[in-house]
Amino acid sequence: MADNCIRLLHSASVFFCLGLLISSFNLLQGIAAENLSKQKLTSWILQNEIVKEVNENPNAGWKASFNDRFANATVAEFKRLLGVKPTPKTEFLGVPIVSHDISLKLPKEFDARTAWSQCTSIGRILDQGHCGSCWAFGAVESLSDRFCIKYNMNVSLSVNDLLACCGFLCGQGCNGGYPIAAWRYFKHHGVVTEECDPYFDNTGCSHPGCEPAYPTPKCARKCVSGNQLWRESKHYGVSAYKVRSHPDDIMAEVYKNGPVEVAFTVYEDFAHYKSGVYKHITGTNIGGHAVKLIGWGTSDDGEDYWLLANQWNRSWGDDGYFKIRRGTNECGIEHGVVAGLPSDRNVVKGITTSDDLLVSSF
């Protein structure tokens, strides 16, 4: 593998070589996970036991409840929703780590939904269906919010476009991906609007269907409406970066620029979160998940928390949202913060070529 990669690099096939390395990494990770937890993956999620243990724990700080979505789910089915793959170090090559001025005075509580109330996208709760597309949702939703905050334009960008068209550069689509790669993709390739390439069809089923699990959709590079051109619908990022893993830097980033994407480790008990400030109480480590962080505060019990929007529908959690302990790197949430700034090249104008010709020349 190493010799082949060296030869490929000398022939300028950098992206193909990187794809081989990432594919090999993911294959080894997948085999290890299957061998270590095959019995666990086929077992049922223990709703009764987990809900009881959390709610009877006086120090839990949060409440659990039965969730119909996971009523008859195996651990493997739950794991399909958790699409953050272990990110190869190569993905962070050249990615800056952003910190902020420590003299910036931050409020004790902050909610992006009220701070930028004109931006309706911030308060949207979506549903990723049975696809491990959380890495794409967290990125696309945060970038949509940032376009509104910076340019005063309400725009919903397409999760489906990123999921289908980023390919091996972002990971494996519905089988998981790398959050930072999504932000790098925005910078170099852009993403179309949801109107151009929707994630949900008109029956309410998740694209491409309502199966228990479904494959990554194909990249069409064509808007569903004949009145739009795919290239003209593109919106771009101007940067992609990691935020320094300190609560003050994360708060400053959200306060100045808007919601960010965060990745964290999910345990079985998280599936049953209902209210309060989450911290891991019981259950096995299931996988990595990505969501949108929109604010922070302190509970009545004095527990500092982050406020986040999940994409498991409003029937999950606290109307689709959850709070998690802040300042202790709970479940690794403060070590996986990525973001980027929107570009004023958000719409490419003056393109008169048909999408059919654009696809053939891409």
Swiss-Prot record:
Keyword rRNA-binding: no
Regulation: induction: By dark-induced senescence. Induced by infection with an avirulent strain of the bacterial pathogen Pseudomonase syringae pv. tomato DC3000.
EC number(s) stated in the UniProt entry for this protein: 3.4.22.-
Subcellular location: Vacuole
Protein name: Cathepsin B-like protease 2
Endpoints of the signal sequence: 1-33
Covalent S-S links between cysteines: C119-C148, C131-C174, C165-C219, C166-C170, C196-C223, C205-C210
Assigned keywords, A-Z: Disulfide bond, Glycoprotein, Hydrolase, Plant defense, Protease, Signal, Thiol protease, Vacuole
Active site: C134, H289, N310
Annotated glycosylation sites: N35, N72, N154, N313
GO molecular function annotations of the record: cysteine-type endopeptidase activity
Record function comment: Thiol protease that plays a central role in plant programmed cell death (PCD). In addition to its role in protein degradation, may cleave and/or degrade a number of target proteins, activating signaling towards PCD. Contributes to the increase of caspase-3-like activity after UV-C-induced PCD and is required for abiotic stress-induced PCD. Functions redundantly with CATHB1 and CATHB3 in basal defense and distinct forms of plant programmed cell death (PCD). Participates in the establishment of basal resistance against the bacterial pathogen Pseudomonase syringae pv. tomato DC3000.
Gene that encodes the chain: CATHB2
A biological-process GO annotation: defense response
